[in-house]
């Protein structure tokens, strides 16, 4: 079994690929198979953002493994104007839906209830198959691998500091 504990920056060369759905890329513990058919065990640090398409991992034996977002069933949402698209995004955000935001479109995992809601709001909704790379969200925090310049990423949380008055 190829055992992986480390996330690393993207590399120009890799020995294997993992084709994973968004749900699988969100797990810190996972048993899966590489595209080459090798048994893989992921044992990543808990509490980190999901793996992203193109990110690399380093196995215990030193091999580099590239993460690929596997195509999955999505809803591709467009609207007649920016106001309607913003309204659709607001309603999806209110439901804490994982959402990929593009220039003039939104994408979310296929869900017939959300599709009906979006159509009721006047959005055009198309079922597609594509890789899914949603936003990390307001509480996702910074993501980096380098230890150089850590002070640049040491942001104190400002939301929900109850009892603190400035």
Curated annotation (Swiss-Prot):
**Cellular component GO terms, alphabetically?**
cytoplasm
List this protein's GO terms for biological process.
protein folding; protein-containing complex assembly; urea metabolic process
> Chaperone: is it a keyword of this entry?
yes
Give the record's keywords alphabetically: Chaperone, Cytoplasm, Nickel, Nickel insertion
> What CDD domains is this protein classified in?
UreE
Note the InterPro entries from the entry.
UreE, UreE_C_dom, UreE_N, UreE_N_sf
Q: What is its main location?
A: cytoplasm
Q: Entry's SUPFAM superfamilies?
A: Urease metallochaperone UreE, C-terminal domain (SSF69737), Urease metallochaperone UreE, N-terminal domain (SSF69287)
> Which is one GO molecular function term here?
unfolded protein binding
Question: From what superkingdom does this record's organism come?
Answer: Bacteria
What are the subcellular locations of this protein?
A: Cytoplasm
Q: What does this protein do?
A: Involved in urease metallocenter assembly. Binds nickel. Probably functions as a nickel donor during metallocenter assembly.
Q: Which NCBIfam families match?
A: PRK13261.1-1 (NF009751), PRK13261.1-5 (NF009753)
What family does the database annotate?
A: Belongs to the UreE family.
Q: Which HAMAP family match?
A: UreE
Name of the molecule in the record: Urease accessory protein UreE
User: Gene name on record?
Assistant: ureE
């Amino acid at each position: 079994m190829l055992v992986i504990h480390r996330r690393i920056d993207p590399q120009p060369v890799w020995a294997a690929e993992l084709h994973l759905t968004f749900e699988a890329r969100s797990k810190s513990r996972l048993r899966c198979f590489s595209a080459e058919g090798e048994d893989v065990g992921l044992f990543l640090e808990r509490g980190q953002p999901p793996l992203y398409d193109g990110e690399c991992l380093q196995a215990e034996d030193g091999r580099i493994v590239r993460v690929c977002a596997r195509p999955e069933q999505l809803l591709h949402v467009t609207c007649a104007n920016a106001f309607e698209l913003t309204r659709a995004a607001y309603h999806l955000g209110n439901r804490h839906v994982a959402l990929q935001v593009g220039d003039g479109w939104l994408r979310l995992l296929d869900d017939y209830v959300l599709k009906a809601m979006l159509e009721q709001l006047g959005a055009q909704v198309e079922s597609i198959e594509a890789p899914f790379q949603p936003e990390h969200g307001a509480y996702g925090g910074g993501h980096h691998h380098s230890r150089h310049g850590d002070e640049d990423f040491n942001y104190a949380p400002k939301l929900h500091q109850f009892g603190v008055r400035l």
